[in-house]
């Protein structure tokens, strides 16, 4: 919710129309892609410097949000994965150091940089499958060796398009059908 509220607040401050629900539909995209889509829809040209400013402001607003506790059971799941000799990879459309630091604080030793795919590692963000295909390559994995856990429709679509078994977890304001329609194999 913090992510979506931050995007909506900053985009509205810059004169764009965006609700938290719409922002959630863009979760997983790179910041540039999100800004470009909204600005084009509204017939505005946003240059590189303005995009950087908007994203920086969004990051600042996000960093002021209250810290949310990890989803119940997530730490235990990651621990079990590692205990069984497997490993987790993180695929995120974000490049915010503060978000990545929060993940490392909440899930110590679960995500190492070599197993993270961020906005800095790809040219095309979600819903393009590139982030997940990059994770497969970086992890030396085949599609049948993976299970994706995703909370955003664009992430579900990207994983599904990459041919990966996808469990959707509805953590937002959207109806379950949005995640299922995006290609989730299972909804939690």
Where are each of the predicted segments found?
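Active-site neighborhood of HAD-like aspartate-dependent phosphohydrolases
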Residues: 1-22, 83
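A metal-dependent, Asp-based hydrolase signature
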Residues: 27-62, 80
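Short, acidic loop-to-helix structural element flanking the phosphoryl-transfer center
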Residues: 63-90, 96-97
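Conserved SAM-binding loop
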Residues: 70, 88, 148-149, 168
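Short acidic-hydrophobic, aromatic-tinged amphipathic segments that line or gate anion-handling sites
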Residues: 186-188
